[in-house]
């Protein structure tokens, strides 16, 4: 079985910018590249799980999301780092348009994408972690017995006051990695 770190994307890996899809707007959070490289070196599967409601709302396409993920991989490769997989939900139950207006099991806080990744990568949840800047990023991890960390980047500073579960708090993705390695 494999150990993994499940990462939210916006506000955790990259600076939070509403409905980010343009490559020119992408910016890693401080220490994110180094953190991902350390996770790779320590044999963690690095798996991104992200809600992409901008697709559901018609702001951008799934192809734009895929293009941005390819760009992220290209940037990480320059530092001998990589993300093992990107999973994202393009749906929204209220604000979705057309086929994307859907109450699904993949949109966080539901755990459908976590369950799929756990199966796809044969993940040992007891040796795994989740990191995000919103409680809704971490609820599916907690539901699957994955140790969870709320980062103070993105929406983390606003979300911290609502913590009621056994989540830990850390400055950013890099500080999380230094705590577990």
Curated annotation (Swiss-Prot):
GO annotation, cellular component aspect: cytoplasm
Positions marked as site (Contributes to substrate recognition): 107
Positions marked as site (Stabilizes the phosphoryl group): 50, 108
Compartments, as annotated in UniProt: Cytoplasm
SUPFAM superfamilies associated with the record: HAD-like (SSF56784)
The UniProt record lists the keyword Transmembrane helix: no
Family from the record: Belongs to the GmhB family.
Protein name: D-glycero-alpha-D-manno-heptose-1,7-bisphosphate 7-phosphatase
Species of the source: Clostridium acetobutylicum (strain ATCC 824 / DSM 792 / JCM 1419 / IAM 19013 / LMG 5710 / NBRC 13948 / NRRL B-527 / VKM B-1787 / 2291 / W)
